[in-house]
């Protein structure tokens, strides 16, 4: 009774059908990143031979905390750690908007996924790179406002 609908569902989720489709365990996974920070450099449009162009820029996120001896940490020193993220935009419409409107110092929100890759540098050394592949960018403000 339920076998036919189950097989149909499995075929929708599994790209390569096999004879053991009925023994497959269907599980979901999630690769999702949300970043809120400031742009560290103006974006660069890059075209790698044989691949679609992409827009690349860096985004800084800050983690701040108070440390001190008292329990509430109200009077302690403020510490900050800045983490830099490499953002790549491949989607054609979003790629062009990011290239045109993302500017150094802009505060933006980025949604995307983490991608780990390897490349060979100009000295023929293999390097690993972590990149955030952006699916959505929300512009929150212009560049940092000058204080009077």
Swiss-Prot record:
This is Single-stranded DNA-binding protein, mitochondrial. The gene is SSBP1. The modification N6-succinyllysine is found at residue 122. Residues 1-16 form a transit peptide. GO terms for biological process: DNA replication; mitochondrial genome maintenance; positive regulation of mitochondrial DNA replication; protein homotetramerization. It is found in: Mitochondrion; Mitochondrion matrix, Mitochondrion nucleoid. NCBIfam families: ssb (TIGR00621). Homotetramer. Interacts with MPG/AAG, through inhibition of its glycosylase activity it potentially prevents formation of DNA breaks in ssDNA, ensuring that base removal primarily occurs in dsDNA. Interacts with POLDIP2. Interacts with PRIMPOL. GO terms for molecular function: chromatin binding; enzyme activator activity; single-stranded DNA binding. Gene3D superfamilies: Nucleic acid-binding proteins. The modification Phosphoserine is found at residues 67, 79. Binds preferentially and cooperatively to pyrimidine rich single-stranded DNA (ss-DNA). In vitro, required to maintain the copy number of mitochondrial DNA (mtDNA) and plays a crucial role during mtDNA replication by stimulating the activity of the replisome components POLG and TWNK at the replication fork. Promotes the activity of the gamma complex polymerase POLG, largely by organizing the template DNA and eliminating secondary structures to favor ss-DNA conformations that facilitate POLG activity. In addition it is able to promote the 5'-3' unwinding activity of the mtDNA helicase TWNK. GO terms for cellular component: mitochondrial nucleoid; mitochondrion. The modification N6-acetyllysine is found at residue 113. Its main location: mitochondrion. Residues 30-141 form the SSB domain. Keywords: Acetylation, DNA replication, DNA-binding, Mitochondrion, Mitochondrion nucleoid, Phosphoprotein, Transit peptide.
């Amino acid at each position: 009774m339920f076998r036919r609908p189950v097989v149909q569902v499995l075929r929708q989720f599994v790209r390569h059908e096999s004879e053991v489709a009925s023994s497959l365990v269907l599980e979901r996974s999630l690769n999702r990143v949300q970043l809120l920070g400031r742009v560290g450099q103006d974006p660069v449009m890059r075209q790698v031979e044989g691949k679609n162009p992409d827009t690349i820029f860096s985004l800084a996120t800050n983690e701040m905390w108070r440390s001190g001896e008292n329990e509430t940490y109200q009077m302690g020193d403020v510490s900050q750690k800045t983490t830099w993220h490499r953002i790549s935009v491949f989607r054609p419409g979003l790629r062009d908007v990011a290239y045109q409107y993302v500017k150094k110092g802009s505060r933006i929100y980025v949604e995307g996924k983490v991608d780990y890759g390897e490349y060979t540098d100009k000295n023929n050394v293999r390097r690993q790179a972590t990149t955030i592949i952006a699916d959505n960018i929300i512009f929150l403000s212009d560049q940092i406002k000058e204080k009077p």
